[in-house]
Amino acid sequence: MPKSNDRINLTNQFLIAMPNMADPTFSGTVVYLCDHSERGALGLVINRPTDIDLQALFNRIDLKLEIEPLLHVPVYFGGPVQTERGFVLHDASENTYTSSMQVPGGLEMTTSKDVLEAVASGKGPERFLLTLGHAGWGAGQLEDEISKNGWLTVEADPKIVFDVPAENRFEAALALLGISSSMLSGDAGHA
């Protein structure tokens, strides 16, 4: 584990689950890290669509969505923490939303309903991914999982988040490292 003065910052990175991932919740996932600090980390799983679409979710929260192309956009499982709460990962915009976190790389993560109201009215971000829940790690927990070969890390590419079909995001994230899933092994060691 790095010393505190050697701390790495994994904000704006993809975490790619290795085959030996101990937690089945994260098996086969790609997580976009929105925040990573000495206090812990927060990320969103980007490749697990649920059976809920925007229309169903918006109906649940009393928002009228009339933009035809968005009706059947899936809502994603963002992680096992706060699964009843929505998290919207989107391109940074000139609009200011009540509760947004800017992420290096030109993205924002917003948790306030005003971003959903903007989407419903056609004035929201053009590219977005809506999740229910998020992934969270306490201080040192993610670093420990990485040191035990639970995750690969690579700088995130927003095109993978927004433009690649969900079922191809795992392989697309691995391709950023120049590898494919057929090259991964559950066995690992340290030199």
UniProtKB/Swiss-Prot annotation:
InterPro entries attached to this UniProt entry: AlgH-like
GO CC, alphabetical: cytosol
Source superkingdom: Bacteria
Transmembrane segments: none
HAMAP family: UPF0301 (MF_00758)
Family that this chain belongs to: Belongs to the UPF0301 (AlgH) family.
Protein name, per record: UPF0301 protein Bphy_2327
